[in-house]
A protein has these predicted regions:
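Clamp-loader machinery-focused feature within the broader ASCE/P-loop NTPase space
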Residues: 1-141
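Charged, glycine-rich active-site and insertion segments that engage polyanionic ligands
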Residues: 1-65, 155-157, 163-321
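Helical "lid/switch" subdomain of P-loop NTPase nucleotide-binding domains
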Residues: 110, 130, 134, 138, ...
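Conserved adenine-binding aromatic site and its adjacent loop/helix in ATP-hydrolyzing domains
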Residues: 116, 148, 174
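Conserved catalytic/switch belt of AAA+ P-loop NTPases
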Residues: 119, 144-159
Length: 321
């Protein structure tokens, strides 16, 4: 049995399709790994790349190089933020202090780099391979440039990883072999993730609900949860219960807007919606939080957006409307 996908939990259909392609030596020019975040698409991509570059039985030394991004014939591209005139990869944004209020993009220059990379002669392997992580984040010009590359496939291999493949051009999707990924069952999630360090064995129910069968999403929700200052979550819940006066509401808006960046604030709204739905199921409150989320996305001054929303909710306007 091949060890290429030993760390992939579940995803039997994806595993079967990828192993068949490797065993038969019939590789498509492009693949689309489609499914929710955090269910193993990147793990599967690494295993597949190892098989493409080293054969069906894999190679441990090559595996380490791929994981470290240290192979001359592999290019891994991810969406970027534009921060002070520089492009910051999504995976480095938090460490770089990027505000992350706007969504990252795959940009035209990145796709041009993909085309050049696939068109060059490989240095070690039989072919060059490129992974486009977050492919649905392509800007329009970038998508059109990628389509031209797909229309003239060479000897290289391209893997697109997408959470929302329907956002890709249909002409791009039609030129890729689809590898579908689904959500994991609870027992499979437990195999992937240990309990949150220093917490009870069970995660807060809202985190599990938001993860919706994705261990990677659960891990991300845990990370955001740990970033929320102590007491803020309880204060948000108390506010809707009517136990917070206007001054306390303004103080809460100040505290969370100063402590959390744009992405973390967006996540906190998402958590708050889920927590309130579990407790009250009042559509008016959820609509108000949807409006707050849109305002935060639209570059409204965050503290002001929070102040207005919290004052309205503390005053009961949205509970009775």
């Amino acid at each position: 049995m091949s060890a290429l996908f030993a760390h992939l939990v579940g995803q039997q259909q994806a595993r079967t399709l990828l192993l068949a392609a490797l065993e038969q030596g019939r590789l498509a020019p492009a693949y689309l790994f489609a499914g929710p975040n955090g269910v193993g698409r990147r793990v599967a991509a690494m295993g597949f790349l190892e098989g493409v570059l080293a054969g069906i039985h894999g190679d441990e030394a090559l595996r380490r190089r791929l994981q470290q991004g240290n192979h001359p014939d592999l290019l891994w591209i991810e969406p970027t933020y534009l921060e002070k005139g520089k492009l910051v990869p999504r995976s480095q944004a938090e460490a770089a202090g990027v505000s992350r209020r706007s969504a990252p993009q795959l940009r035209l220059d990145q796709i041009r780099e993909v085309s050049r990379f696939l068109g060059r002669r490989p240095l070690e392997a039989e072919r060059c391979v490129v992974v486009l992580d977050g492919a649905e984040a392509m800007a329009e010009a970038a998508a059109n440039a990628l389509l031209k590359t797909l229309e003239e496939p060479g000897d290289g291999l391209l893997i697109l990883i997408a959470t929302a493949p329907e956002q890709l051009l249909s002409t791009i999707r039609s030129r890729c072999q689809l590898i579908p990924f689904g959500r994991l069952r609870p027992e499979e999630i437990e195999r992937v993730l240990p309990p949150l360090a220093g917490q009870e064995p069970q995660d807060p129910i809202e985190l599990v609900q938001l993860a919706a069968g994705s261990p990677g999403a659960l891990q991300e929700h845990r990370r955001h949860w740990q970033a929320v200052p102590e007491g803020v979550a309880d204060r948000l819940l108390q506010l809707v219960e009517g136990g917070v006066d206007p001054l306390q509401a303004l103080e809460l808006a100040r505290d969370l807007s100063e402590a959390l960046d744009g992405e973390q604030q967006q996540w906190l709204v998402q958590w708050w919606q889920q927590a309130l739905w579990n407790r009250h199921r009042q559509a008016a409150i959820l609509r108000r939080l949807n409006r707050l989320s849109r305002q935060l996305q639209a570059y409204v001054q965050p503290r002001l957006a929070w102040e207005v929303a919290l004052l309205e909710l503390a005053g009961g306007r949205e509970r009775t409307s």
